[in-house]
Amino acid sequence: MLSSAIAPKTSDDQYGVLYTAHDYAAHGRYCDRVVIMTYEWGYTYSSPRAVSPVNEMRKVLSYAVTKMPPSKILLGFSNYGYNWLLPWKQGQAAQVISNAAAASLAASVFAQIRFDEAAQASFFNYTDPAGRRHEVWFEDARSVHARLALVREFGLAGISIWTVNMRNRAGLEVLESEFSSEKIV
């Protein structure tokens, strides 16, 4: 089996190393599976936002299925979140946080977890003991369910989870209840 992992793009005319380096049609022709890395919209040096926003993932998939068979596509999504210090400043690094740690942190600081409908992602704000404000975006059962719905909507081969070593019990329960799994290493 030949597989590849490619950056997300939404058109043939996107410029930049991550976009022009990947010919979606060629990957679809020559590969048995293509992982589209639809994560890191929110990343270490970005402003606070969802790591894998469904609205952005949908744009990428709408383009991808015009270039390769959906049955070859594995939807890549994150299994982690980020904790940003506020106010965010250019060049300021966010801290990676596991989904379980994010949920525990929210509970420990009595933060209200909110859900962004467009991104289909969970987030909360809190103030740490030093008086600094934070914003945390992460994946929970609702966001995992929304991403799995994209697999059905586009008729994809399945998913590829980035950072499987970060346990996300709620996400795994949703995955196991909706799909059968095959481990490919």
For each of these PLM feature ranges, what is it?
Residues M1-S108:
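Substrate-binding surface in catalytic domains of secreted glycosidases
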Residues Y15-A25, E139-R152:
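Short, acidic/polar
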Residues Y45-V51, R133-W137, I161:
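Second-shell loop/turn segments in exported
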Residues V51-R58, F138-H145, M166:
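Soluble non-cytosolic domains of exported or imported proteins
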Residues T66-P70, E153, S181:
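Secondary-structure boundary motif
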Residues F77-L150, S177-V185:
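Glycan-binding loop/region signatures in secreted carbohydrate-active enzymes
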Residues H145-I161, M166-R167:
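Conserved, well-ordered alpha-helix/loop/beta-strand core segments that scaffold catalytic motifs
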Residues I161, M166-V185:
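C-terminal amphipathic alpha-helical "assembly" element
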